[in-house]
């Protein structure tokens, strides 16, 4: 039986908004498994949290650069937020993003790329020696469309193009570039705020859909719904899930009476051509890192080849 700590209970409460005692029971019943505890609470009708909010144990910056029909987003980690506010580190992040725009989003290719008389990897190593703290290029992603634009947005940017959360979104269209750019920035801001998991329902991981269906069906059974009705009301529940979790079906943050898909359709008149969301990437600093903060320096050192 796993030990249930106060920190685990606190985290589950922050994710789900459920009371402490229910959170402790959920963790106990599920042997400390956070995702299973979330699903257990949802089946009891106590929580609406649809997915695990990963614990963030990283510092650093997200960098975003776009140019016409392509764009990149990168994450460069440091050990402390103090370094993330350092001008040299901020310049490093912007340089890495610019290189990624030229050579693509493969981390190893970016590290091997030359800037001036040194590779990106060497430049990072030199910054480590100068600043006195480990740092690493953790990940990168890119988007490109044959016709259209890639728009970017950084939430609460500390400098132009770098902050704790960054988004790029590709709008495929033969329409007016200026109108597309304005529309793309709004959609990127929406993605930063609403955190969709996919462009539309077809892009949602089938395993996620299956788990959602199982949670909904179990919840309705516990509510005493007739078995003959469960499949129908589960499908209705899935429609709500997709409306909350997929970009085109979410209420648009700039006009919540319309979905993002409806807003795009209406914008086609201004753009002068059909508009399609070809894809998006949303990076929040440190997401997916679930180590204790005290272990993060070791992870950065290992990634940087320091140990």
Curated annotation (Swiss-Prot):
Any one annotated GO CC term: cytoplasm
Molecular-function GO terms, alphabetical: translation elongation factor activity
Subcellular location: Cytoplasm
Region (Involved in Mg(2+) ion dislocation from EF-Tu), start-end ranges: 80-83
Gene3D superfamilies: 1.10.286.20, DNA helicase RuvA subunit, C-terminal domain (1.10.8.10), Elongation factor Ts, dimerisation domain (3.30.479.20)
Keyword annotations of the record: Cytoplasm, Elongation factor, Protein biosynthesis
Keyword Protein biosynthesis belongs to the record: yes
PROSITE patterns in the record: EF_TS_1, EF_TS_2
CDD domains (alphabetical): UBA_EF-Ts
HAMAP family xref list: EF_Ts
Record PANTHER family: ELONGATION FACTOR TS, ELONGATION FACTOR TS, MITOCHONDRIAL
Family note: Belongs to the EF-Ts family.
Function: Associates with the EF-Tu.GDP complex and induces the exchange of GDP to GTP. It remains bound to the aminoacyl-tRNA.EF-Tu.GTP complex up to the GTP hydrolysis stage on the ribosome.
NCBIfam families xrefs: tsf
Name of protein: Elongation factor Ts
Organism: Nitrobacter winogradskyi (strain ATCC 25391 / DSM 10237 / CIP 104748 / NCIMB 11846 / Nb-255)
Gene label: tsf
